[in-house]
């Protein structure tokens, strides 16, 4: 008969795991993959101690992986999109015009706002980061902007749409699991989103004016290199435009990315004159490669391909497998139940919900679980304490959706790091919007700002 995991047992396991991960990443300076494998083995040993059968543990690993099949496939496709859009001249064209228009001091805030607009229209941070985000990173590199700052601006802007857009899957998922109307949920999000985003804009404005940048001569040399090696045409922008339009029309992400790849290949053939099928396959697999004569431009355009995403895909697979085992042996349930004790006030309830979402993100690396599990666990307590459930759905978004990109082994974190070429640990200090939002939701919960009672919500619906 299986044993039930106690709070002490749960804290011991999590403590051991976090010690391994933190020591490995910050002291030994190694990649997170093997430390997570070690944690997986330790979790399995703990599971056997609790008398969970090995077959059950294997099934839990498979169940954990099932959650990540779609994100993994998207990771692979985005790697291909990047390579194809380099080959087609799409990113070089955006880079050329971006260097001509955007001044260095306005780069950070411009990137933030551009990515915010695109993600709001598409509802997808992955699509935004993998398309316009890559182009903005290239512009930032050419302008001499710190890559960590550029990545922070891209991630903040991209995650705005993930949180606020009615087209976003998490924006629909969070209110859906707790029975809150979608647009009530979005309106309620404004209480924490507006101040967090305004502060983020101000911080990026301040940072932008203090950045050392490339000289005019350097920029002109890059423009010359781009113009000499690529056919820079508005036709190369049709592919990303089509991707954005299809995403706005709520087409599924995977078919949208496939369309982006196919139209990019067609553009490469007719605009760039690259009709070599064998070279297409090589670029799709290994990434775009060209010597432009400018070292900075070479570093920007020589990237992408399926192979470039294998680091992230393998990390996500290990993390999701670990998350499946952790969930199966009862660690997450025990952790959540321990947080539901002594919930006597609205502030404590919202703080406990946020802490749970962050904890599930850290333990499993999975965004949806960080919304689903705390949502179902705490839902009845919001009714019991007469706190409007739109506070619950808002907290799940602020601490679930937005924290995942801050976890190096999280699905979003691994994807953003691989796509932008900047480690999560490096861009984290500049991901202002992502950590300001959960802070605001906890603070407002205690201060009573932007919250309502369940009874008033019920009357409104009636």
From Swiss-Prot:
Subcellular localization: Cell membrane
Ranges facing Cytoplasmic side: 1-6, 51-71, 119-125, 209-228, 272-306, 374-401, 451-462
GO cellular component assignments: plasma membrane
GO MF, one example: antiporter activity
Membrane topology: Multi-pass membrane protein
The keyword Transport belongs to this UniProt entry's keyword annotation: yes
Residue intervals passing through the bilayer: 7-25, 32-50, 72-91, 98-118, 126-145, 189-208, 229-248, 251-271, 307-326, 354-373, 402-421, 430-450
Signal peptide: none
Listed GO biological process terms: sodium ion transport
InterPro entries noted in UniProt: Na/H_antiport_NhaC (IPR004770), Na/H_Antiport_NhaC-like_C (IPR018461), NhaC_Na-H+_Antiporter (IPR052180)
Keywords from the UniProt entry: Antiport, Cell membrane, Ion transport, Membrane, Sodium, Sodium transport, Transmembrane, Transmembrane helix, Transport
Entry-linked Pfam families: Na_H_antiporter (PF03553)
Primary location: membrane
Residue ranges annotated as Extracellular topological domain: 26-31, 92-97, 146-188, 249-250, 327-353, 422-429
Tagged with keyword Cell division: no
Family: Belongs to the NhaC Na(+)/H(+) (TC 2.A.35) antiporter family.
Stated role: Na(+)/H(+) antiporter. Involved in pH homeostasis and sodium extrusion.
Name of the protein: Na(+)/H(+) antiporter NhaC
Phylogenetic classification of the source organism: Bacteria, Bacillati, Bacillota, Bacilli, Bacillales
Name of encoding gene: nhaC
């Amino acid at each position: 008969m299986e044993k039930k995991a106690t709070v002490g047992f749960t804290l011991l396991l999590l403590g051991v795991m976090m010690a391994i991960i933190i020591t490995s990443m910050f002291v030994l300076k190694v990649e997170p993959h093997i430390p997570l494998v070690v944690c997986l083995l330790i979790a399995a040993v703990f599971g056997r101690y609790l008398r969970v059968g090995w077959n059950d543990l294997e099934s839990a690993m498979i169940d954990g992986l099932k959650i990540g099949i779609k994100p993994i496939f998207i990771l692979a496709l985005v790697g291909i999109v990047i390579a194809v859009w380099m080959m087609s001249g799409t990113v070089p064209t955006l880079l050329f015009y971006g260097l001509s228009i955007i001044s260095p001091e306005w780069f950070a805030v411009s990137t933030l706002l551009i990515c915010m607009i695109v993600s709001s229209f598409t509802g997808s941070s992955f699509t935004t980061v993998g398309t316009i985000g890559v182009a903005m990173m290239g512009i930032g590199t050419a302008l001499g902007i710190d890559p960590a700052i550029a990545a922070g601006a891209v991630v903040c802007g991209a995650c705005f749409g993930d949180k606020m857009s009615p087209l976003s899957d998490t924006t629909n998922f969070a209110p859906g699991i707790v029975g809150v109307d979608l647009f009530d949920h979005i309106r309620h999000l404004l209480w924490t989103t507006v101040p967090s985003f305004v502060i983020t804009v101000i911080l990026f404005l301040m940072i932008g004016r203090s950045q050392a940048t490339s000289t005019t001569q350097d920029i002109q040399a890059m423009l010359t290199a781009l113009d000499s090696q690529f056919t820079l045409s508005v036709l190369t922008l049709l592919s990303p435009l089509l991707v954005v339009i299809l995403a706005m029309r709520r087409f599924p992400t995977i078919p949208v990315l496939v369309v982006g790849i196919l139209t990019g290949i067609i553009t490469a053939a007719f605009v760039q004159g690259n009709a070599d099928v064998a070279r297409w396959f090589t670029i799709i697999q290994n990434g775009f490669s060209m010597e432009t004569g400018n070292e900075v431009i070479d570093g920007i355009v020589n990237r992408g391909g399926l192979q470039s995403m294998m680091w992230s895909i393998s990390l996500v697979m290990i993390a999701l497998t670990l998350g499946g085992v952790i969930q199966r042996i009862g660690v997450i349930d025990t952790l959540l139940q321990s947080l539901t004790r002594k919930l006597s006030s609205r502030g404590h309830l919202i703080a406990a919900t946020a802490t749970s979402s962050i904890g599930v993100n850290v333990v499993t690396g999975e965004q949806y679980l960080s919304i689903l599990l705390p949502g179902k666990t705490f839902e009845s307590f919001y009714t019991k304490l007469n706190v409007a459930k739109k506070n619950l759905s808002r907290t799940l978004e602020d601490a679930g959706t937005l924290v995942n990109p801050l976890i190096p082994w999280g699905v979003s974190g691994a994807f953003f790091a691989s796509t932008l070429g900047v480690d999560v640990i490096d861009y984290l200090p500049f991901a202002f919007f992502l950590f300001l939002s959960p802070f605001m939701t906890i603070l407002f919960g205690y201060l009573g700002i932007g919250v309502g009672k369940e009874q008033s919500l019920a009357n409104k619906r009636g």
